[in-house]
Amino acid sequence: MEYQSSVENLDEDGYTQLDFSSRNITRRSVVSEKGLCAASSHWRLIAVTLGILCSVMLVITVVLSTSGIWRSSSGNNLLKSDSFPSRNKDNQSQPTQSSLEDSVIPTKALTTTGVFSSSCPPNWITHEDSCYLFSTLLDSWDGSKRQCFQLGSHLLKIDSSKELEFISRQVSSQPDHSFWIGLSRRQTEEPWLWEDGSTLLSNLFQIRSTVTEKDSSHNCAWIHVSDIYDQLCSVHSYSICEKKLSV
């Protein structure tokens, strides 16, 4: 049997035939398998890399979306809070008694012609039986009236020519400013009344008119230097508060 196998491998001249074809096929199959493994590893690396990139992009997208929603919600809440201010905010904007009493005219007239008394609150000056506060808070006539009320007083009421002279000395050092007093009227044709409802004495002083053709509703009064003028009640100006001297 061995002899027959050897004979089959001999050619016509008696040389042995080598089976190179089977070996070549085996080598090619091995090379092909190695190539497939290398290619598979290469694509697997690419797939893993792409998967990681997609995951990162997904995380970034989620974070940005969440941030955008939070900012939008915050913006809406801010608009709501600005559009509908709370009552506390309005209350905080109101002047306190301390700020009202501190807002006095810092002039020489106050220290030379006015007298500070322990019977009056700080920054108030004394004249006869009354205390006076010359406020530098700019407000309308109604607003100034409320400020004085908060301090337990009222807008200035002039009862005599002597009191008018005293007040004129205090405000004459402020020629650029006018001061609301407690004199007003409901209509142009109606009489001038003080806050307590009493009428203005005709022989005490005359009210100078500032009425123009465009606007005739000057129904509040202020003092400028030594004269009294009518004026629009909505105009913002300084004011004078008065209250009786404490015994």
UniProtKB/Swiss-Prot annotation:
- A GO molecular-function term, please? pattern recognition receptor activity
Looking up InterPro entries in the UniProt record yields: C-type_lectin-like, C-type_lectin-like/link_sf, CLEC7A, CTDL_fold, NKR-like_CTLD
Q: Where does a divalent metal cation bind?
A: 157, 159, 163, 242
Membrane topology qualifier? Single-pass type II membrane protein
Keywords per UniProt: Cell membrane, Disulfide bond, Glycoprotein, Immunity, Inflammatory response, Innate immunity, Lectin, Membrane, Metal-binding, Phosphoprotein, Signal-anchor, Transmembrane, Transmembrane helix
* Record flagged with keyword Membrane: yes
Offer a single GO CC term for the protein: cell surface
Q: What is the lineage of its organism?
A: Eukaryota, Metazoa, Chordata, Craniata, Vertebrata
Protein name as annotated:
C-type lectin domain family 7 member A
**Which organism does this sequence originate in?**
Bos taurus (Bovine)
Which cysteine pairs are joined by S-S bonds?
120-131, 148-241, 220-233
Primary localization: membrane
Q: Where is this region: Disordered?
A: 81-103
Give binding positions for (1,3-beta-D-glucosyl)n.
146-153, 195
